[in-house]
Amino acid sequence: MVGQQYSSAPLRTVKEVQFGLFSPEEVRAISVAKIRFPETMDETQTRAKIGGLNDPRLGSIDRNLKCQTCQEGMNECPGHFGHIDLAKPVFHVGFIAKIKKVCECVCMHCGKLLLDEHNELMRQALAIKDSKKRFAAIWTLCKTKMVCETDVPSEDDPTQLVSRGGCGNTQPTIRKDGLKLVGSWKKDRATGDADEPELRVLSTEEILNIFKHISVKDFTSLGFNEVFSRPEWMILTCLPVPPPPVRPSISFNESQRGEDDLTFKLADILKANISLETLEHNGAPHHAIEEAESLLQFHVATYMDNDIAGQPQALQKSGRPVKSIRARLKGKEGRIRGNLMGKRVDFSARTVISGDPNLELDQVGVPKSIAKTLTYPEVVTPYNIDRLTQLVRNGPNEHPGAKYVIRDSGDRIDLRYSKRAGDIQLQYGWKVERHIMDNDPVLFNRQPSLHKMSMMAHRVKVIPYSTFRLNLSVTSPYNADFDGDEMNLHVPQSEETRAELSQLCAVPLQIVSPQSNKPCMGIVQDTLCGIRKLTLRDTFIELDQVLNMLYWVPDWDGVIPTPAIIKPKPLWSGKQILSVAIPNGIHLQRFDEGTTLLSPKDNGMLIIDGQIIFGVVEKKTVGSSNGGLIHVVTREKGPQVCAKLFGNIQKVVNFWLLHNGFSTGIGDTIADGPTMREITETIAEAKKKVLDVTKEAQANLLTAKHGMTLRESFEDNVVRFLNEARDKAGRLAEVNLKDLNNVKQMVMAGSKGSFINIAQMSACVGQQSVEGKRIAFGFVDRTLPHFSKDDYSPESKGFVENSYLRGLTPQEFFFHAMGGREGLIDTAVKTAETGYIQRRLVKALEDIMVHYDNTTRNSLGNVIQFIYGEDGMDAAHIEKQSLDTIGGSDAAFEKRYRVDLLNTDHTLDPSLLESGSEILGDLKLQVLLDEEYKQLVKDRKFLREVFVDGEANWPLPVNIRRIIQNAQQTFHIDHTKPSDLTIKDIVLGVKDLQENLLVLRGKNEIIQNAQRDAVTLFCCLLRSRLATRRVLQEYRLTKQAFDWVLSNIEAQFLRSVVHPGEMVGVLAAQSIGEPATQMTLNTFHFAGVASKKVTSGVPRLKEILNVAKNMKTPSLTVYLEPGHAADQEQAKLIRSAIEHTTLKSVTIASEIYYDPDPRSTVIPEDEEIIQLHFSLLDEEAEQSFDQQSPWLLRLELDRAAMNDKDLTMGQVGERIKQTFKNDLFVIWSEDNDEKLIIRCRVVRPKSLDAETEAEEDHMLKKIENTMLENITLRGVENIERVVMMKYDRKVPSPTGEYVKEPEWVLETDGVNLSEVMTVPGIDPTRIYTNSFIDIMEVLGIEAGRAALYKEVYNVIASDGSYVNYRHMALLVDVMTTQGGLTSVTRHGFNRSNTGALMRCSFEETVEILFEAGASAELDDCRGVSENVILGQMAPIGTGAFDVMIDEESLVKYMPEQKITEIEDGQDGGVTPYSNESGLVNADLDVKDELMFSPLVDSGSNDAMAGGFTAYGGADYGEATSPFGAYGEAPTSPGFGVSSPGFSPTSPTYSPTSPAYSPTSPSYSPTSPSYSPTSPSYSPTSPSYSPTSPSYSPTSPSYSPTSPSYSPTSPSYSPTSPSYSPTSPSYSPTSPSYSPTSPSYSPTSPSYSPTSPSYSPTSPAYSPTSPSYSPTSPSYSPTSPSYSPTSPSYSPTSPNYSPTSPSYSPTSPGYSPGSPAYSPKQDEQKHNENENSR
C-alpha cells in the first residue's frame, strides 16, 4: 500500500473463490505478533501494550499513530492478524458435529476407514462424485461398524480372508455432550461384565492425533482436501487474532476505553489459556486441568458462536450476551445480507412525492436543492468544454453549476473553497462533477420493490419546492399514492449506466409489463373520470374552448377538425377533440355485450385511423387493460409515442375538466323516497326468511346438505339470504341513481369505487364476518350482553341493515369494527408472509438467464428449459389471440376455409381475383389448396386435443388481425375490386413465412424439435388467419398489401424473441410474488358453499412452495368413465365404493354387559334377535356355546348413516366376522328392526384358566376399540368424505361445435391416488388430485410438474389475477428439474450445488460457510450474488457477453485521424439530405438529385411504383406513411431510427437497401472510396462525388450534358435490371421491395435473412458478384481501406502505409478520377456498354 499512485486502470476481477481451513502453520505465517497478554494497554494506560491484544504491530486505530507493520496511518492500514498459541487443542465449535461424524467413520486407534472397497455398498458410496453426499453415504455405512477389521472375506472365494490392514480394535459409540465427545466401549463377552460399557471423555489431543493419522486417500474419500482442508485442522491449536480495525475500541476520555465484544472474548480466552498453562506447568491434579481445559473450550466456542444449544451464553458485565463472530455474519442485519448484498449508497436522494399532471410520463420533478447536491462526473471533451467551463464558473451554489473538478492525475478541486474557481482552465480528459440538469436519466424507486417496474429510469426536470413530482399514470407500477409516500432517486455515475437506464429502464419501455403481457400503466383518477365525461355523446364544445383545448395538444398540427354540428353554431364533440391527441394509424375495436355498430347506449369502442368513431372512453379503453388503447399504441407506434399519448390525453382532458368541473358530495349518496322504501322492504323480507329458517331448524325440520352438518347448512342459508338482500338493495340504489350522479360517474368511468361501495353507502352495509363466519358467540351463548342467549337473529350475529348514510347503531358499529379489525390484522400478517415468500422465490430463481443458445440456464450452466417459456418469446411482446380453427361446426369451418376449384359448392367467386376465371378447374392449384385445407383440419384436431374445452384464447406474439387492418388502411383496400393476388402467391407466401420464423437456429435434432415446438401454436394461428379464402374473401388484400403483411409479421415475430442475457428467473419470481402480495391471506369466498373446502391464497401458495407433505386439504377429483358421466346413479355407486366407511362412522353407541347365558339375555330389547337367531342354529355354533364368554359387547348402529352409505346389517356383521375369524361370536338384528343391534361375544379356547376369565372385560374393551377404529366396511383408505358435484363440460358435438354436457364429478376429502385409480367405473386418465406429491409418486415427474403448475396457476387465478404462463412454468421447472420436488426453502434449493457464497446469502449463512471450508469448495463466481458480494459486474444482461479484440488488425488498421476529420465524417454519414453536409464541397455546383441520387421521388412513375405506397419520397417520415413510426416501426426489418447503417447517403451501407443488388451485373463494388466510413471519403477531395466511382468534373466523359451520361440513356432505364440508384423508381422508403427486380421480391427465396446473399453486416457481399472474392484479405465493409478489387489499394501491398507521402487523400496522385488509380475502369466501361445493349 506504500505510496500507491492514483491509477485509472480497472482492477482485475475475482474469477473464483476457494474455501478452506486455516492450518496452524498458516495462522503463524500470517501473524505479525504473538499475543500473550489479555490487557490492551501497558501500565501507563496510554500506549498499547506490546504482546497485548491491541499490539501496535496489529494495526493502528488511533489517527495519531502509525501501524508498526506497514507504516501507514489509520485510514490506509487494513490491519494485520496476530495469533494465540493454545495450551491444549480445542474443538472448533462449528465443526464439532463433523468431528464426531469423522470419528465414527475411522478407527479410533489406527485412523483407518472402517470400511473400504471390499464392501459392495461402500464401493457405491465411494463412487459418488459430490464430496458432501459421499461423506454422508460413507458415514451412514460406517457408523454402525463397531470393529476395525484386520481381514475380510475375499470376493472371489468367501471362505478365504484377505488382509485389509485394520487393527482389530472395537470402536466406541460416540455421544456429543455439550462441547465434549464421550465414547463408550462395549466390552468383549470374554472379559466378562458385558453389561457395563466403559465410558470416558475423548480428549482433543487423542482425536487430533487420530486425525493426523488418517491417510490422504481416506480423508479425500471423506470429502476433505489435502491442500485446503485436512481433518486435523478442524481442531484448533493456534488461534488467529483479528486486527483492531475489526474490533475497534471507543475512548470516553484519556484513561477510559470501552473495548469491543471480540476483544473482551479474546481476553477471556487468553486468561483461560494462561491459567491452563500455569496449572500444567505446576503439575496440578488431573481434574483441575480438565476444568481449565473445558473453560478454554467454552471461551473459544462462545467467541465464535454464542448461541449454542444447551450451552450457557457468555455474558458481558452488564448481563448482555456477547456478540460472537457468527452473530456478526448471520441474519438480515449481518455482514453478508446487511453490508455485502446490499449497502447504503451515495448519489441518492429521498423525499416525499406529489403528483403533477403537466409532467411527461417519463419525467420526474426534482427539487432544486436536490439537483444542486447530486452530481454527475462528466468528462471534458471538445464538444462540451464550453458548457462545462460555464458550469464551473457558476460554482456549487448556483444551478446549473458544478461542485468539483477532477484532474486526470486524480486530484479533486473543491469549488466551494477554490479561490480561483472562475479561471480554472479545463483540459480534455478532466472530469467535472456537475449538478444534475434537465433530461439527465435517473433511477427512481419506491419500496417495497416488488417487481421490476418498482425501479424505472425517469428524465430529470428541475423544479422549485421540496418534493419529487411525478405524472399520475406512473403511480400504479410503483403502487404509490400522495398521502405521504416517500421515494428514492439514484443518479448514475458513468456513461454506460446512463445508456442502460435510458435504453433499458426508461419508463416508456416498461409500459407493457412482461408479468401479464399487458400495460401496467393507464389513465387514472380525475383524467379517467374526465375522459368519460368528455366523450359522452352529448358533450359538445364551442369554438373558443376548442381552440384553447387544441393548444394543449403538444404536437397539434394546426388543423382544426371539421365541427360535428354546424347549425345553429359550430360545435365539436368531445370525441373529436380527444381524437386529435391519438396518433394516426391506430385501429381499435371492442364490442361489449349487446354492442351493435350503432349502439343506443354508446358502449363498445371503435377507433379507426386514430379517430374515435363510437363508444364512451373509460377504463376498458385507456386503463391498463389487455388490448386497450395504451397497449395498441405501444405495439404499433412504439413506446415513445405511447408515453407522449399519456401526456396528450392528460393535458387535453384535464384542461376541459378544469373548466367543466366535477365534484362529489353527500348528496350523491342519497336515493329517493320510493327507492328507500323498496330497500327497507327487501331487507325486511330477508329477515323474515331468516326467521322462518331459524324456526325450521329449531323444530328439527331442516335437512342437512350433503357434506355439511345441520348447523353449517342453517348458517349457509342465513348468510345466503342476507347477502342476496344486500345485493338486491344495492342494485335498487344503483339503478335509481341518475347517470348525472357523481359517485356513479366515478364508478362507471372506473376511476374510483365499485358497485359494492354504492350499495353500502346508500342501501345497506350487510353482514359482517370474522374468519368467514357470522360473528361468533364471545360471551356465554351470545355475541354481546345486549342480546338474549341463543339469539341467532341477523342483528345479533352481525348483520348491519343500515347504510353508511343513515349511520350504524352501537351494536352494528361494534360488529363492523370487529370485521374491520380482522381485515387490518390480516393485512399485517400477509405483508410479512408474502415478503418472505417473495424473497425465497427471488433467491431460488435469481441466477436464471436466457443464454445465447436460447436455453434458460442457472449459474452452474444447468439447463432449466431448452427454450424460454417453451416458445422463446419475450412476454411483453405477446398478446391474447384466438385460434380461429378450433371453434364452430364442421360445416362452418369448411365454408370458411375450404376452396375447391373443381366443385361448385366450395369454389371461389371469380370476381375476387383478377385471374378469377382462369383458375377454375386448375388441378395443380387444387393440389396446393387441398394441402392447405388438410393442414387446417389437422390444426383443428391438434388444437382440440390441446385446448380440451375449446377455449382457444392464448397469448401469442404478433397481432395478425391488427397488421391486416393496418394493411387495409394503408393500401386503401377497395372491397369491391378484384385482387391481383394469385392463389399460389398466398399459399407459398404463407409457407415460406413459416420457414422463416426462426426462434432457434441450428441443424441438430434437439434444436429442430425445440424450434418446431416453439412455433407450433403461432403457425396454427398464422395458417388460420392467412388461409386463401379469408385473404381473398374477408380481407380482400392486394398483392402489394399481402406481401407487406407477410414481411411485417416476420419482422414483428423476430422482434418478439426474448433477448439473451434477460434475467428471466427474477422476472418470474417477481411476477408470482407481486400478485401474491395483493392476495388476501385466507380466502373465505366460499363461506359454507356445499363443496370441498380448499386451502387457497397465501397459505396454499406457502404449502406449494414448501412442498408440504401433509397439506391442510388434500383432495381428489374423480371423473366417471366416458358414457356414464351424466348418470347420477352410477356416480352414487362409485361414491359409496370409494368413500371410506369405518364401523365407527355408522355406530351410535357401544356398550359392554355382563350377560352370562349365551342362549338368553338380560336386555329385554334383544330377546327377539336371540330367538330368531337360535331358530336357525347349526352344529358348529352349538359347540361354541360353552366356550362363549359371559361378557357381551353390544353395538347400536345409526340407521340414517347406514342408508346414506347403502349398507345392510348382513354386510356389517359379516365384515366383523371376517376380521376376527372364529374368535368372536356375532349375531345381528334385521335391517328393518326398530333398532339396529350387533351382539358380540369372545369365544375362549378350551384351556382357559380362571385367572384369564377375570380379565375378560378388559380384553373386550380392547376388542371394542379395535373394531371401531380398524374395521373398514367399504371404500378406500384416507378418503374421508366424497361430495358429488354436477359440472358442465364443453365437448364437441357430432356436427363439430362445442356444446355443454352435464357430468357428475366426485370431490373427495383425503387422497389415495393409486388405490382410487383402480376402482372400476372411473376414468383413470382424467383423475386429478391437488396433492402433486402423490401425482409425482404415482405417475412420475412430468405429471408431477404439470400438476404443480396447475396448482400454482389455481392459487393465482383464484384471486382473479393473471400471470403469463412462462413465469409459473419457470418456477415449476426449477422445482422439478432435479428429478424430484425441490422446495423453495433452505432445505430445498439451498441444498443444491450452486456456489457457497450464493447459498450463504440466503439462509444458514455461517453453517454453509463452515461446510464450504471443511470440504474445500470452489466457487466460480458465475452467479449474481457472488458478484454482488465482490462488487463486480455480474455476467448477466449487458454483462453477459465478452468482446474479442483482434489485436493484429487493430495495429494494422488504426488510421491516424485528426478530430476534425472524424467530425466531418460523422456529419456526412448520418445526416441525410443536407446541402451543408460535411461531405460536399461547396465549390462544386452539383444538383441535389445527383449528389444523393437515391432521393428521386418514388411515386412519380405509377406503372413502376417502387415504393410500397403511393406517397412520394418526400412523404417519408410523416405520420401518414407506414414508415413514420419510431424504432419499433412494424415495417421492414431493421428499418427505423435505431437501424445502425441506414442513411440515404450510404446505400451500400444499409442492410435494407436492396436497390444495390449485388447480383445485378453492372454493379460492382469497385468504388474504392464508396463507404462513409472510409477515410478517403472526405470533403477534402474535390474530385469526388458519391454517384460515380470515376466522376471528375473535369473529365469530359462525365457531365450532365454529355450524351453518354443522361438519365434517359438506356443503361439507366428504370426497367433495366441494373436498378441504378438514380432510377426514379428506387426510393429509400422501399427498402426491401422492388417489383421489377425478380431477385428482390420479399417472398423470393433469395431474400431471406438466412440466405447467404443477405447479411446485414456485409451489404455488398454476394457470392454471385463477379468481382468479389472471399480470399481478398482486405475485404471488410468496415475497414477504412475497403476495396476488394483494386490490387494497388490493398492494405497488404508493400507500398501501402498510411504515413507514406504518396498516400494522402489530398495529394493529387490520389484521385479516384485519375486513370492510374482505377485498374478496373476499362472493364467497368465495358460492362456498362454491355448492359446498355
Swiss-Prot record:
Alphabetical GO biological process terms: RNA-templated transcription; transcription by RNA polymerase II; transcription elongation by RNA polymerase II; transcription initiation at RNA polymerase II promoter; translesion synthesis
Keyword Transmembrane helix: no
Keyword DNA-binding listed: yes
Location(s), subcellular: Nucleus
Residues annotated to bind Zn(2+) 1: C67, C70, C77, H80
Example of a GO cellular component annotation carried by this entry: mitochondrion
InterPro entries associated with the record: DNA-dir_RpoC_beta_prime (IPR045867), RNA_pol_asu (IPR000722), RNA_pol_II_repeat_euk (IPR000684), RNA_pol_N (IPR006592), RNA_pol_Rpb1_1 (IPR007080), RNA_pol_Rpb1_3 (IPR007066), RNA_pol_Rpb1_3_sf (IPR042102), RNA_pol_Rpb1_4 (IPR007083)
Sequence repeats: 1549-1555, 1556-1562, 1563-1569, 1570-1576, 1577-1583, 1584-1590, 1591-1597, 1598-1604, 1605-1611, 1612-1618, 1619-1625, 1626-1632, 1633-1639, 1640-1646, 1647-1653, 1654-1660, 1661-1667, 1668-1674, 1675-1681, 1682-1688, 1689-1695, 1696-1702, 1703-1709, 1710-1716
Catalyzed reaction equations: RNA(n) + a ribonucleoside 5'-triphosphate = RNA(n+1) + diphosphate
UniProt modified residues of type Phosphothreonine: T1471
A molecular function (GO) term: DNA-directed RNA polymerase activity
Pfam families cross-referenced by the UniProt entry: RNA_pol_Rpb1_1 (PF04997), RNA_pol_Rpb1_2 (PF00623), RNA_pol_Rpb1_3 (PF04983), RNA_pol_Rpb1_4 (PF05000), RNA_pol_Rpb1_5 (PF04998), RNA_pol_Rpb1_6 (PF04992), RNA_pol_Rpb1_7 (PF04990), RNA_pol_Rpb1_R (PF05001)
Binding of Mg(2+) 1, residues: D481, D483, D485
Chain positions of cross-link Glycyl lysine isopeptide (Lys-Gly) (interchain with G-Cter in ubiquitin): K695, K1246, K1350
Biased composition (Low complexity): 1538-1719
Basic and acidic residues: compositionally biased ranges: 1720-1733
Record region (Bridging helix): 810-822
Sequence positions that bind Mg(2+) 2: D481, D483
Domain comment quoted from the record: The C-terminal domain (CTD) serves as a platform for assembly of factors that regulate transcription initiation, elongation, termination and mRNA processing.
Family statement: Belongs to the RNA polymerase beta' chain family.
Remaining remarks: Mutagenesis experiments demonstrate that the minimum viable CTD contains eight consensus Y-S-P-T-S-P-[A-S-N-G] heptapeptide repeats. Identical and simultaneous substitutions in a number of consecutive repeats are lethal: 'Ser-2' -> 'Ala-2' (14 repeats), 'Ser-5' -> 'Ala-5' (15 repeats), '2-Ser-Pro-Thr-Ser-5'-> '2-Ala-Pro-Thr-Ala-5' (10 repeats), 'Ser-2'-> 'Glu-2' (15 repeats), 'Ser-5' -> 'Glu-5' (12 repeats), '2-Ser-Pro-3' -> '2-Pro-Ser-3' (15 repeats) and 'Tyr-1' -> 'Phe-1' (12 repeats). The binding of ribonucleoside triphosphate to the RNA polymerase II transcribing complex probably involves a two-step mechanism. The initial binding seems to occur at the entry (E) site and involves a magnesium ion temporarily coordinated by three conserved aspartate residues of the two largest RNA Pol II subunits. The ribonucleoside triphosphate is transferred by a rotation to the nucleotide addition (A) site for pairing with the template DNA. The catalytic A site involves three conserved aspartate residues of the RNA Pol II largest subunit which permanently coordinate a second magnesium ion.
Protein purpose: DNA-dependent RNA polymerase catalyzes the transcription of DNA into RNA using the four ribonucleoside triphosphates as substrates. Largest and catalytic component of RNA polymerase II which synthesizes mRNA precursors and many functional non-coding RNAs. Forms the polymerase active center together with the second largest subunit. Pol II is the central component of the basal RNA polymerase II transcription machinery. During a transcription cycle, Pol II, general transcription factors and the Mediator complex assemble as the preinitiation complex (PIC) at the promoter.
Protein name: DNA-directed RNA polymerase II subunit RPB1
Protein species of origin: Saccharomyces cerevisiae (strain ATCC 204508 / S288c) (Baker's yeast)
Lineage of origin: Eukaryota, Fungi, Dikarya, Ascomycota, Saccharomycotina
